[in-house]
């Protein structure tokens, strides 16, 4: 049986000053568990900057955005920062409609997000 092409997978990469979480596939209420688990671990381990690299997302609904916003709140309460990189069309429209760009820092590339966190 072939895996669902929209199934969400998540890669995590750590560096000295950041944790990068890269979800790939469809982020919705039914498939958010891999990202939820990765964010929970990253939030507990982040040295200050948590970057959610959204370049691999093909879809995101309000449940996915709520998950990201909840993680941002936890990270900021602990004194860190959560930023988004490369939201692309799957997430950009949702960010705009929800007004989430008012509370989330969004960068066009992963490199820009990481560089902003070094300052």
Language model features by range: what are they?
Residues 2, 11-12, 74, 96:
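Short secondary-structure boundary/capping segments
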Residues 105-119:
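A charged, well-structured terminal subsegment
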Residues 1-7, 115-119:
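Short, low-complexity, intrinsically disordered N-terminal peptides in bacterial proteins
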Residues 15-16, 55, 87, 111:
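Conserved catalytic submotifs in the C-terminal HATPase_c
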Residues 17-18, 81-82, 86, 118:
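Long, contiguous secondary-structure blocks with strong helical propensity
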Residues 3-37:
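STAS-typified acidic loop motif
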Residues 17, 100-103, 109:
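Glycine-centered tight turns that cap/initiate beta-strands
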Residues 27-104:
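Amphipathic alpha-helical interaction surfaces in cytosolic regulatory modules
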């Amino acid at each position: 049986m072939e895996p669902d092409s929209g199934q969400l997978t998540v890669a995590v990469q750590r560096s000295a000053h950041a944790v990068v979480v890269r979800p790939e596939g469809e982020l919705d209420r039914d498939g958010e568990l891999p990202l939820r688990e990765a964010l929970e671990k990253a939030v507990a381990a982040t040295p200050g900057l948590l970057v959610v690299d959204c370049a691999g997302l093909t879809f995101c609904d309000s449940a996915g955005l709520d998950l990201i916003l909840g993680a941002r709140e936890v990270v900021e309460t602990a004194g860190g920062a959560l930023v988004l990189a490369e939201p692309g069309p799957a997430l950009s429209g949702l960010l705009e409609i929800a007004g989430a760009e008012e509370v989330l820092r969004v960068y066009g590339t992963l490199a820009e997000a990481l560089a902003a966190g070094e300052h």
